[in-house]
Amino acid sequence: MTSLKVLIAGAGIGGPAAAFWLSRIGCEVTVVERSPRLRATGQQVDLSGQGIVVTRMMGIEDDLRAVRCPERGMRFVDHQGVTKAFFPVDYSGKAVYSPTQEVEVMRGDLVRILYDATKTLRGVKYVFDCHIKHFSQDDAPSGGKVHVALSDGTQDSYDILIGADGIASATREMMLGTSFPDLHRDLGVYMAYFTAPSQKDDTFDWSVCHISGGKAIMTRRDQPENIRVYLATRVGFDVLDAAKTLADQKAALISLFKGTQGWQVERFLNNLENSPEADDLYCQRMSQIRLPKGAWSKGRAVLLGDAAFCPGAIGGGVGTTAALIGAYVLAGEIEKEWEGCGRKTEEFNAQNATKEYERIVRPFITSRSDMSTWMVRLWLPESNFGVKTIQTIAGFAAGSQMSKYRGNSKPADETQKLEYPDYFGLGPKP
């Protein structure tokens, strides 16, 4: 019996998740990763709602819960560390506002779990230190191939090419062409992330301190010995963009935050300058990827995850969940089209599957990534009055919410309904 040949670019989250589902329908899947090894790094990510349902169907939910970060919730503090509002972790899915989701894990742990769940599956092969150089496609809508040249010198033909290679996707550029309009939507925020040694009184909360002048300092703690520090700013982009080396980036951040009235700002700037843990510093301008309708795919090439729909780290925190949902639906629609043509490669029409995948998943993305610049200005206010306003509103909201949901500490119902087609017969039974 023939099988579909699928090439996936990117071994992060969406790529391996798609490989998992495609393996179930007998596809021959090759995952190429530009890095010479698995990139099991990154900051804390969250899973919620349908993302948890998908991991449950994959059989990896227990593995994820075993490495869940012990974060208790989000805490707003003033420059002296006094708590102004606290939003506990939401186990019920009913809270008005809870940035800390039921399942919060480090990105590296999720990447490793997905890789371990797929690396020995029948028909799945990983190739590291390898990327797509270029590809071309046959014109025929059915039965044609996408012809790919890889950086290791090999050339092959596939029935489908999936670009799951992130926000700076090379696959996307090759698919759409260099003349396609710029897809990055700048959110007007610069974020820096680094690790610092923890202290005895550091809590396992997501602590947020707003600083006048359009800045904020945040911390999250996923392990006893370290704390993760986040610096956010709406100013100083020229200095930060000009900083190319690690030393220059540290100096630029120190100059921007030194002397500000931020909670423990002196401690964290000292860590940034002198602690070896802070050498993992990563800086980025926050942006979204928002492709126009119909642009998630072209012919037999299709985009997945941040390559197609990056909502941004401050765009609702749904990127990881979206990638898992997208991988599930894409593979499911491929399976449906494959069965519909009698599993005959000469009659398989990838475009039917990829267009339906976009139709089903796009509403989820659109509803959760419509963040405009005024919302960013609200989150990072310029004035002391703006900072106090945020703290007051947060305190009122937290007080109302806590009185309504206090004590709700049980995980979400394990029979939570699958809101997408049950392609593989693994969804919760009524």
From Swiss-Prot:
Cofactor names: FAD
SUPFAM superfamilies, sorted: FAD/NAD(P)-binding domain
Top enzyme category: oxidoreductase
Usage in biotechnology: Eupenifeldin is a bistropolone-humulene meroterpenoid first discovered as an antitumor and anti-leukemia agent. This metabolite also shows anthelmintic activity against the parasitic worm Hemonchus contortus, anti-malarial activity as well as antifungal activity.
Gene Ontology biological process terms in this record: terpenoid biosynthetic process
CC cofactor note: Binds 1 FAD per subunit.
Enzyme Commission designation: 1.14.-.-
Keywords tagged on the record: FAD, Flavoprotein, NADP, Nucleotide-binding, Oxidoreductase
Gene Ontology molecular function: any one: oxidoreductase activity
Xref: Pfam families: FAD_binding_3
InterPro entries reported for this sequence: FAD-bd, FAD/NAD-bd_sf, FAD_aromatic-hydroxylase
Gene null: resulting phenotype: Abolishes the production of eupenifeldin.
Entry binding sites for FAD: A11, G12, I13, G14, E33, R34, Q43, R107, Y282, D306
Pathway: Secondary metabolite biosynthesis; terpenoid biosynthesis
Tree of life domain: Eukaryota
Family: Belongs to the aromatic-ring hydroxylase family.
Entry remark concerning the domains of this protein: Consists of an N-terminal FAD-binding domain with a Rossman fold, a substrate-binding domain and a C-terminal helix that bridges the 2 domains close to the antibiotic-binding site. This last helix is flexible and may contribute to their different substrate specificities.
Function: Flavin-dependent monooxygenase; part of the gene cluster that mediates the biosynthesis of eupenifeldin, a bistropolone meroterpenoid that acts as an antitumor agent. The first step of eupenifeldin biosynthesis is the biosynthesis of 3-methylorcinaldehyde performed by the non-reducing polyketide synthase eupA. Oxidative dearomatization of 3-methylorcinaldehyde likely catalyzed by the FAD-dependent monooxygenase eupB is followed by oxidative ring expansion by the 2-oxoglutarate-dependent dioxygenase eupC to provide the first tropolone metabolite, tropolone stipitaldehyde.
Record's protein name: Flavin-dependent monooxygenase eupH
Species: Phoma sp
